[in-house]
């Protein structure tokens, strides 16, 4: 279980995150929604080790992870994707997949260089695994294409594939629907469901209400740095006043 306790983050005296409490049960797909500036991304950054809280704590199981570096949370099985995918643009899709394990360990290039023989021994295994994941994502036909040639939706699938290369326990998905056409969005939704069925937990921040309602339960509603509501899709959908206030629906 991921547990967030009394989490606060201040920037220049302003609370971006203010006394936030919630938990994510292992095996679930939990959604975190809210307007721009609600504090969702800051919360994600703290969980993933890209930022430290001003106060409060985050636990993964019984281990406190608040204040850890991103490569340390990565070692625990927490992988974060980004709203704007970050592939190595000069590499092919397959090369991007195979680079992920070394790229998130917090090691410098020199350390990777002196470990070249060890890396080479793993190359065949990594290649086989990468091709298997690309087939699962329906990207295998694009394996030799430069990643810069991919569409927005294909890049999101590649991000998901890169996350899967590390055998994650939890994936933090940042706006998986952003810049994605409806056809590929359905593909992404299907793949998230299937990965979840493999035992991977998801925490998703998203503005796309359709995706959140289809995929997530429970759903956390965040505004002005605080969690305003937590409930099932039906409970969130039925609170018309809340949706009107936050999303103008």
Give the residues covered by each predicted segment.
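The feature captures the beta-strand-to-loop junction immediately N-terminal to the Walker
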Residues: 33-35
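Catalytic Walker B motif of ABC-type/P-loop ATPase nucleotide-binding domains
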Residues: 171-175
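Conserved catalytic motifs of ABC-family nucleotide-binding domains
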Residues: 167
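Conserved ABC ATPase "signature" region
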Residues: 110-142, 190-193
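Conserved ABC transporter NBD signature motif
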Residues: 56-63, 75-76
